[in-house]
Amino acid sequence: LYWYSAQKKGYSGVAIFSKIKPKHVEYGCGIEKYDFEGRIIRLDFDSCSVMSVYHPSGSSGDDRQAFKMQWLTDFQNYIDDLKKKLPNLILCGDYNICHKPIDIHNPKSNANTSGFLPEEREWMEQFIQSGFIDSFRHFNQEPHQYSWWSYRAGSRGKNLGWRIDYNLVANHL
């Protein structure tokens, strides 16, 4: 078990379970304001690198939405640089973004909700197009496949969810 948590107890963190010992473990991305929140851990193996990532949520207000949008820009730059030396990347985690209308139970009513904002979805599209495959959607095009449900109003039982968790694989793998 390899893990990296936020300095604030109970706030956020990431982990990777592996039976294989990695060649290298990288904690964080080197940007202090994100590393304080335990957002990234990466394990490098002989043939690939696996990253667990936890993107910020913007749902608590404008300040956190701005933080999230800055994170998205910085994360893209970080991954673009990383791909130059570690091209065989597998990025797993909570992106706090529903990529397409199929990934959310009610796209119309959530059109202006953090996690499904047009600018977030556009970022996700461009990020995937920069060299990744959404491994779940590659094999499963069915609607109503979610990874998160609100605790309110029995959302899980009604399958009123959001698909915000992704396993993105370098497209040449």
Regions found by a protein language model. Name each.
Residues L1-G58:
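Structured beta-strand-rich core segments of catalytic domains in phosphoester-bond hydrolases
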Residues W3, R137, V169:
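Short beta-strand and adjacent tight-turn residues that come in two discontinuous sequence segments
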Residues K8-K9, P22, H55-S60, N96-C98, ...:
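Short, solvent-exposed loop/turn segments at secondary-structure junctions
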Residues I31, P56-L72, K108-N112:
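Surface-exposed cleft-lining segments at the edges of enzyme active sites
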Residues F36-G38, F45, A66-Q70, D74:
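Residues forming well-ordered secondary-structure scaffolds
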Residues T73-I164:
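Metal-dependent phosphoesterases centered on the DNase I-like endonuclease/exonuclease/phosphatase
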